[in-house]
């Protein structure tokens, strides 16, 4: 396989994002829409899997994350929606100027499609682990742990550091304050930002989305069980949504959870299914 290209994406508001292009022959591109606080390197093995089958893949670190973060997150001014409307949009634009684009999303990636300036530029999207985020959809005791994160650990951590120190709570990368505030507010609502009158500027765009979307969740995903997925994807009223329930035993693993979709244990069976689903909408697999 061709060596990945480390590139810089320029957003519409002038921010510079670290990104990686896994090159393949031809003009087919998959853009990976990362989960909240997850650096692009986490998706490397899936990107290499698709690249080996003749598909270009683009991954990026959103602003404030991974190689796109400033020297300090304290005082870093941004909103959660910037990751979708500006950062993911820059990755899609990069791919769209070079060929046809499909999207593979993880968690936030399912929320981001409807926030893109023009989601209909995508041929189709397959997203994993995207749900409404409300703790009430989660099984016990996860709902109590998440409630404690928002109402106890989060407020203490943000007061101490000026950002959300997720890494100190075993939860991945630290999050900018603007991301924490928006995420906390929307996760308090059963249908996420669709229940927030102040988010109307975001949610109104979802009705414009008319692409096919595969919305896959594992039945053991504590953060995005099927009911949570269904609550959120009602917002894509004019898209063709294919709700896909995955069983860990069907993938030959004991656990998938919220992060296992892009780990190689489950990926051995899941990734071919993902590309096969996208193939219904024009993606062609070839040996790179």
Language-model features, listed with the residues they occupy:
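Active-site glycine-rich loops that stabilize anionic/oxyanionic intermediates
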Residues: 27, 32-38
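Short alpha-helix in the alpha/beta-hydrolase fold that links the catalytic acid
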Residues: 224-235
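Short beta-strand/loop motif that positions the catalytic acidic residue
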Residues: 209, 215-217
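Alpha/beta-hydrolase-fold enzymes
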Residues: 104-191
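Alpha/beta-hydrolase active-site loop
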Residues: 77-96
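Conserved alpha/beta-hydrolase
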Residues: 40-73
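Catalytic active-site module of serine/aspartate enzymes centered on a nucleophile-bearing elbow/loop
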Residues: 242-288
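N-terminal cap/lid segment of alpha/beta-hydrolase-fold proteins
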Residues: 1-22
């Amino acid at each position: 396989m061709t060596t990945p290209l480390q590139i810089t994406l320029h957003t519409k508001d002038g921010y510079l994002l670290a990104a990686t292009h896994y090159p393949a022959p031809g003009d087919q591109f998959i853009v990976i829409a990362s989960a909240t606080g997850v650096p692009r390197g986490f998706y490397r093995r899936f990107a290499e899997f698709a690249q080996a089958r003749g598909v270009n893949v683009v991954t990026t670190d959103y602003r404030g994350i991974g190689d796109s973060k400033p020297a300090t997150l304290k005082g870093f001014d941004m909103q959660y929606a910037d990751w979708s409307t500006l950062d993911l949009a820059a990755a899609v634009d990069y791919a769209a100027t070079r060929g046809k684009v499909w999207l593979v999303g993880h968690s936030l990636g399912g929320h981001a499609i409807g926030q893109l300036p023009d989601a209909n530029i995508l041929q189709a999207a397959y997203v994993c682990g995207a749900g409404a985020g409300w703790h009430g959809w989660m099984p016990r005791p996860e709902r109590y742990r998440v409630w404690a994160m928002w109402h106890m650990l989060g407020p203490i951590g943000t007061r101490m550091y000026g950002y959300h120190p997720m890494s100190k709570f075993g939860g991945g990368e630290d999050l900018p304050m603007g991301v924490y505030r928006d995420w906390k507010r929307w996760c308090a609502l059963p249908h996420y930002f669709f229940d927030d009158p102040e988010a109307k500027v975001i949610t109104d765009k979802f009705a414009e989305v008319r692409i096919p979307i595969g919305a896959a969740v594992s039945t053991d995903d504590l953060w995005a069980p099927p009911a949570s997925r269904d609550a959120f994807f009602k917002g894509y009223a004019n898209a063709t949504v294919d709700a896909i329930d995955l069983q860990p035993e069907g993938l030959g693993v004991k656990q998938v959870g919220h992060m296992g979709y892009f780990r190689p244990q489950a990926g051995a069976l899941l990734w071919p299914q993902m590309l096969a689903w996208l193939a219904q909408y024009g993606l062609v697999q070839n040996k790179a």
